[in-house]
Amino acid sequence: MVAPAVSTRAVLAALALLAAGFGEGPPDPAGYRNPCPATGSAVAVFSRTHELYLCREGVPHARIRVALGRGGMGKRRAGDKKTPVGSYSFGEPRASARYGTFIPIDYPTAEQTALGYTGRDLGIHGPPRNWKDVAAATALDWTTGCIATGTDEEVERVARFVRDERPLAIIE
């Protein structure tokens, strides 16, 4: 059997890929970074990708697609329909007639209040009770500043995590 001819160019390209670390398992996607802080528990929300991660000791345990405030990010005043950015503690998850389960986020922080930020009743919840097409719950940003999961099961999973872990909310 005759070995197929391989061009010098192909060999050099293969060597360059090996030298760059390819071929040693799957490469990380360009720009990948671990979404979780190295220690502790956190619910990390990334506005750019519309993803929420449940994190424990630097390891993501769940990834959930979310919708955000229709006014964008960077809440500063009540009624601006923006989702706040920063680190927050959680209140106790509770039943909600409108959303099933509501997980309060302690916004604004004392520092934000000192800077004049206003707003209240922000948190994580599922789709509204009256929506027929829950698949649309994360298709676009529709909330008045909250973070919305696509299903009741997802918000319940977040609520259990908040009750069990007492995590920090990190929103960016």
For every predicted segment, state its role:
Residues M1-V11:
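Bacterial N-terminal signal peptides that target proteins for export
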Residues A10-R33:
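Bacterial Sec-dependent signal peptides at the C-terminal "C-region" and cleavage site
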Residues P27-A42, L68-E92, F102, D106, ...:
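N-terminal post-signal-peptidase region of extra-cytosolic proteins
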Residues T39, K82, E92-E172:
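Exported/periplasmic cell-wall-interacting domains
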Residues V45:
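Short, surface-exposed binding/anchoring microloops in extracellular/periplasmic proteins
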Residues V59-G71:
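Short Gly/aromatic-enriched secondary-structure transition segments
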